[in-house]
């Protein structure tokens, strides 16, 4: 569930429910340089740069890297490219590549917001994460070798906090009634210095338009 920069229309108001999402562990065959090619093998649900998303009543299980994640577009942009402009590569068949100049699209928000994950069943038969990607290695060193059910990248926009430490409602993220889960907040914006499994700050609810 994602938005990319420089689209003519940006998506929001998404409901994903009654799905069985499982065993997505095949090698990533995306075209090199494309945004899809950066997704690690063993990823279940990814919610990227999209607002007003409800993920509920799903079974999400048996992924070797992560069952679900809520991330900014920024997590896919290599740090060396954020300041250094790189000549765009033309990919076949209109395939989208990672755009380090995404901020030039003033209508695009690279950050997820108003995401509510609730009433899902998370399971995993794997006891050890895949080590062919950086996230799997991160879980070994930071998460006791456990594969997260829900991960939040912790990359926030400048207006994430308003009136001191109050979170801007536009970027609210809530979790509820998903059973016993392994949750991680990465703090990826600060080299994982405040990496935590503490879920308390995200145990909340978000009201959505019932007509959607």
Task: Report residues per predicted region.
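A generic structural motif
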Residues: 50, 63-65
